[in-house]
Structures are given as C-alpha cells and as structure tokens.
Amino acid sequence: MAARNKQKKRAEPESDLCFAGKPMSVVESTIRWPHRYQSKKTKLQAPTKKPANKGGKKEDEEIIKQAKCHFDKALVDGVLINLNDDVYVTGLPGKLKFIAKVIELFEADDGVPYCRFRWYYRPEDTLIERFSHLVQPKRVFLSNDENDNPLTCIWSKVNIAKVPLPKITSRIEQRVIPPCDYYYDMKYEVPYLNFTSADDGSDASSSLSSDSALNCFENLHKDEKFLLDLYSGCGAMSTGFCMGASISGVKLITKWSVDINKFACDSLKLNHPETEVRNEAAEDFLALLKEWKRLCEKFSLVSSTEPVESISELEDEEVEENDDIDEASTGAELEPGEFEVEKFLGIMFGDPQGTGEKTLQLMVRWKGYNSSYDTWEPYSGLGNCKEKLKEYVIDGFKSHLLPLPGTVYTVCGGPPCQGISGYNRYRNNEAPLEDQKNQQLLVFLDIIDFLKPNYVLMENVVDLLRFSKGFLARHAVASFVAMNYQTRLGMMAAGSYGLPQLRNRVFLWAAQPSEKLPPYPLPTHEVAKKFNTPKEFKDLQVGRIQMEFLKLDNALTLADAISDLPPVTNYVANDVMDYNDAAPKTEFENFISLKRSETLLPAFGGDPTRRLFDHQPLVLGDDDLERVSYIPKQKGANYRDMPGVLVHNNKAEINPRFRAKLKSGKNVVPAYAISFIKGKSKKPFGRLWGDEIVNTVVTRAEPHNQCVIHPMQNRVLSVRENARLQGFPDCYKLCGTIKEKYIQVGNAVAVPVGVALGYAFGMASQGLTDDEPVIKLPFKYPECMQAKDQI
C-alpha cells in the first residue's frame, strides 16, 4: 500500500511504449490541467506543491510537474490505451502488479513522458488485509490516491468493470457481473479508512425494499424510524443517539433493546417505557428472530423470501394435520390433566424448564387461573392452540413486538470482546475469534446480516485496533463490506464532547449502499492528552487531522461537573434525595440537572420531579474508610501520603522502622498498594482533585488500585458523580444494587458522544451531509439536551 504513495522507479525507455496521435490542444489542456501550465513568473510566486485535499494531510502534498503538452492516448505493446482506461502497473519484485486508472497523459517540460494514475486497491491492500477471503473474488476498490509516474511504468491494459452496488434486502437476488478481469462497486479512501459506494448518483429513496414487512412498516410509521440497541446496558448510547437524531430533525425511537444484565434492562425500561426490552443473550435473541419470522410467514403476515431453518421441534406437517382441531375453539371437554390456554403473554428462545436444550417458548396465561400460574411452555407442545397463537402473532406483528428484516432502520451496539482487553493476560493473539470471550462480535454481525438495517453503529474499546494488529476491527469491516455495507472507522474521546473524562472508544459506521454514510462529529472541547493508539491508526482519532483549524472550548474539569452535588457520607441508604437548594455553579451542572420534562428525553419515562437519584457511594469497610481518612485533601494525594511509606526514585516501600496500624490491628498501608506495579503507581487510594480530568470511569469503585476518592470528602465518587462524568442526565435513574449501578455506568457509552453521533447520523440520513468524513456540530453538550419549548 505504501508503494502507491511514492513515485515508481523509472523503467528504461522502450520503443514499443509511447504517446499516440497528436497532442491535445493547448486550450483544452490548460482548461483541464491549469496547474501543469503555470508561467515562469507564476511558478516563482505560486506554491510548488499540490494543495492537500479538503480535510487531508500535509504529507499528501506532492511536487507539481509542469507539462509541455497533453495526450489522450498512448501505445503499449501495440495496444492503444486511452484516458480513463485501466492498466496493470509494474510492481515490486515477486509481488502482484499494481492496478490503476489512467487519468492523465503528458510530456513534462524536461521531455519525459508521464502518466497520472488513480489507484485501485485489492482487498488485501486495504484495512481488510488478512480477511480478503471474506470479500467476493475479483472485487477491487477505487481509491482517491493519485500520483505521477513515468509512462514506462504501464505494463498492460486490464478490464475492470464498474457495477452498481446492490441493495441489501432479504430477497435472494443473483448478482450479474459482466465478463472482466476485476470489478469495483466501492471506493476506498484512506482518511478514516472509508469504503463508500462508487455510485455517485445514489438516491436514498431507492433503499426501500419490496419486502411486505418493510412496506407495512413504512406505511404505519412514516414519521418514525426504529432503532435496535444490542448489548444495550442501561441504554446510554441509544439515549444519546436518539437525542442527537432529534436535534437533526429525525424522529428515532429505540423500539427494541437486548442485554444479558437484568439490572441494566430494568434501568432502560424505567427510563424508556416505549422500548421492548429483552433480557437475554444476543445469540438467543437471534434464534428467536428467526423463529418469529417463520411464524409471521406461517400466518401470511410477510412473504417468504428465503429459507430460514426452523430451530423449534414442531414440524409444519404436524400442525397442518391438526388445522381443524383447535381445542381452544371447539369447546370440547378437556382431558384430565389438560389445561386451556386463555392467551399468550410472551415469547422467548431459551430453556426455562432446565432441560439442557433451548427451544422456542411461549408464556401462557391459563384459562381460569391468575397471573401467579403463568408458565413458559415449549412451542412443540402447543399444537392444538393455533387460533390463540395466530392471534398473538398478528398482535405482535402489528405492534412490532420483535424486529423483522427490513423493519429496523438503525442498529447500535457494542459487542463485548473481553478476550482482547489489556487486562486479560491470556489473550489469544493468533486466533482471537477462537476465544469464546470474543464470539459476540460474530453474533452481532449475524444479527446485522439477518435484519439488514439501513444503518449500523458499532462501538468498542481501542484494543479492537491495538490487539493483534487490529484483528477484530479488520474482521468486522471485511464482514460489513462482504455484506455490501459502506463503512467508516474512527475513534472519539468523551472529553472532546464536553465531559471531564478522557475515555477513548472506537466507532464503526456501516450504511446501506443507497444511504449516505454518516460522518464523524468533530470535537467541541479540548483534550490535552496523546492517546496510546497504534501508529497505523493514529489518524482515525476524530479531529486529529483538523485540530489546528478547530476552535475548541476549554476542557471541563471534575469540579465543573460535580461541585453542586450535596455532600454525602460513606453510607447513604436512600437512592433518592433533594438537591438541598444547591444552585448549579456551572453551565454543565445547570443543564445536566434539568427535570425530565425540560429535556429531549421521552416525557413519559422515569420520574417527572426534579430529584437527585443514585447519589450513593460504594460503602467502604471500616478498614478502607479509615485508610481514606489518612489521605490528605490535596492534589495528587494517595497511599504514599499514609504514615510509614518511604519513596525513593519514584518507588514506594514500607518504612522498616515504623508500621502504622488501623483500629482493627491491620496495617494502614496494605501490601497490595506497595506491590501494585512494583510500587511505581500513584493510583492506590488516590484522591481526585477539582481541576483534573478523570481518565476513564470504570465499572467498580474500590480505591485499592485506582484514583477514585472524592476531592474533599472521605469516600469514593458516588454513582451519580460517575454518571455525570459519563454525561447521564440527573433524571436518568438506575436500578439494582450500588455495585450494579457502578457497573452500568462504567460500561456505558458517554451520552454526549452518542448525541454527537446521533446528530451526524440524522443529517446523513436526510441527505444533508457531503462526502467529507467529518462534520462540525452546531451545539455543545449538555446545553443541547434542553427541549426547544424550554429555551
């Protein structure tokens, strides 16, 4: 790939390679390539380098060669090559030849014949790299990379066909590729490693499928677009995303969410009663969707488009034999031990009976019994309840109980990949996808392949790029491209969007061919930190390339976010309290503490009053609480300030002559604090300070090896204080134990990052963005969270 960006070594002149025909007219040449025909006077005054592309990098600039004349054709081995023909270009020894499009033929002012190439990339030369086998054979990508090369670099002509990028629908359509050596339907652009449609005339309206489910969906919900939040946690990403979309003018609703954590699901349901919250594993959710589609086809609610293998045990033939025998409708007397189904209440794919085998299950309300007798029953045993089943499926179809292919406009989610975490000492570097902890990435991709949404936003930790040379990121992009999705990759730091927290994360956009690929929102605030990202991916940090042109607000600090919160002790029993008339001291505090009715959040969720929720710290044991009391209330204080600690050459050790004791008789300075990173860390029992920016909000609050102690109070930061560092509105109440709430907040995508991405999505989905990979935000967080009718 690097070889394309350097001038090729000039080959020896060959008699069978030359320009053909007469030179083009001076007038036409100067109109088409004015930069090649600068006068000597102009050349002395003008820049000697070609300006970088808008949003591009300085290192992309190149010396502009001056021309005597231009040609529109050349002769290579007796074969005529015209402008815009595709050619093989002499490559490196032992390697495949390069592929390029000839976009200029000219004789330089020194008499040397040149051509200008626009390069094609094979899959293995792109971000896809080692996963080129996932992409269709003969498929190449036209890049935006261009440069001048001696005419002698041309090896031969090659036949490359441009074909339309097909719609992504649930219908099986045989794609017709004309006879060719290669074909392309996408462009590959190095900034943000974009794969975009090569069809510049795409029409967003053409993205609608002919599937009956989608047609029904569009008719019923013309003004609404539905979002599925996978691995949703407590809903931070989708909450911010929908608010951002709303600011852009798009009504996006989180219609479905899926997460395996019950407490996180409870939190999401409390704040978003409009959402169908599924507390189950993503792979079970996918199995359920396939069965749901089969049921909808069975009752002629959607047309059958392609075979979906049934996972249930009930065969259609058995049901057909009993079509006329429905105990619920015949009024026949029940046999002893039989019960009559009154109605179905729910559906899942699982094993509630504990048999060891997961199957399709329905929640049954039994006739003559109350809800305490409701049970999950396997679908295979409900063959005599066809009418009740049909009624349930029809009602579920109308209410969009579960998503069907074509009914989901956007999917967002962060598939957990603990197998790549830097905290995992047993990572599988050679084959990360063989690690069960990374399997959810494949499940996520399978769900996308089944539902075929218009847009996808995938989030993950930066280790996605750092681990094993970006193995999982490359696999994800290759999979999306193989499904014919456009993709764009970037990294965004929470602090860049109005939070006193660094927290850098990877975000991957994917969009259907006929949709506009969303850009990344440029930062609004300063972040004075260099992120530890691989050199290959450093330009994926959103705003890095454009930083010198941005006017950013000052970075927020911890005090800016939490100074108005009432003081609390180590133990707080109640998770609801008043603000105690404490007035917000900063703009951030003013807007983050708005009542729900004053924000862009759905008005019918959560608590409508202005109360303070979850301002509870993790309860420290007596020993740790006493240790915290030894930490001075000053900047940079930590366990090294405890009595009996000596520091030499930035390494802490115990004073052998003095060992302070706690009231319990244990040592004030625990051994784990001294041994952590061999005594060189300052994190154990570290006290935060008001003018600081927190590195990353984590899922636990123990102070043993991290800096989480409140600046002026002898306790760790509360759940609500952590939530503010993540940008949660104060009205967003959480469910579960205090430890569970810390986990939900720590796992969340920072809300303002979601807002910024939602706005970019909304603008792109309306066709209001250009082809640039970034967009400037017209607002700041959390001011943007205020509802328009409250301004």
From Swiss-Prot:
This is Putative DNA (cytosine-5)-methyltransferase CMT1. Changing residue 198 to T: In strain: cv. No-0. CDD domains: BAH_plantDCM_I (cd04716), CD_CMT3_like (cd18635). The gene is CMT1. Residues 79-199 form the BAH domain. One of its GO terms (biological process) is DNA-mediated transformation. Residues 339-404 form the Chromo domain. InterPro entries: BAH_dom, BAH_sf, C5-Methyltransferase, C5_MeTfrase, Chromo-like_dom_sf, Chromo/chromo_shadow_dom, Chromo_dom_subgr, Chromo_domain. May be involved in the CpXpG methylation and in gene silencing. Its EC number is 2.1.1.37. It is an enzyme of class 2 (transferase). One of its GO terms (molecular function) is DNA (cytosine-5-)-methyltransferase activity. Residues 308-333 form a coiled coil. Changing residue 560 to V: In strain: cv. Landsberg erecta, cv. No-0 and cv. RLD. SMART domains: BAH, CHROMO.
